[in-house]
């Protein structure tokens, strides 16, 4: 059994609750355990994963959050830099499922976050589980 850490950016709590529900369900159904920690926004997710990884307590991570396009350039920065930060950590060998949604509006986020619809939290957890199993096989 592996220990997964879900790191969620708690900016849109009602959407994140659904993402977490989907992720936890996927992890637990696969026979693993998980914990959840919260950070203020998507840009803080890579730093939190780095801090948690340094403890040696976790085998894999799931990054969850919602970034909704607004009227300023801020969306592009947050969407791009949070994805870049997560990707850099995976290239350094960490196992991370990226479930940071980048959407045009709240309705798109709702459909993607809902475990009964697109279930992107569950998908991110399943990606992390798959990569954890691959890393274990190749080690």
UniProtKB/Swiss-Prot annotation:
Its EC number is 2.5.1.78. (2S)-2-hydroxy-3-oxobutyl phosphate binds at residues 71-72, 112. Keywords: Riboflavin biosynthesis, Transferase. It catalyses: (2S)-2-hydroxy-3-oxobutyl phosphate + 5-amino-6-(D-ribitylamino)uracil = 6,7-dimethyl-8-(1-D-ribityl)lumazine + phosphate + 2 H2O + H(+). 5-amino-6-(D-ribitylamino)uracil binds at residues 11, 42-44, 66-68, 98. One of its GO terms (biological process) is riboflavin biosynthetic process. Gene3D superfamilies: Lumazine/riboflavin synthase. It comes from the Bacteria. SUPFAM superfamilies: Lumazine synthase. GO terms for molecular function: 6,7-dimethyl-8-ribityllumazine synthase activity. The active site is at 74 (proton donor). Catalyzes the formation of 6,7-dimethyl-8-ribityllumazine by condensation of 5-amino-6-(D-ribitylamino)uracil with 3,4-dihydroxy-2-butanone 4-phosphate. This is the penultimate step in the biosynthesis of riboflavin. PANTHER family: 6,7-DIMETHYL-8-RIBITYLLUMAZINE SYNTHASE (PTHR21058:SF0), 6,7-DIMETHYL-8-RIBITYLLUMAZINE SYNTHASE DMRL SYNTHASE LUMAZINE SYNTHASE (PTHR21058). HAMAP family: Lumazine_synth (MF_00178). Belongs to the DMRL synthase family. This is 6,7-dimethyl-8-ribityllumazine synthase.
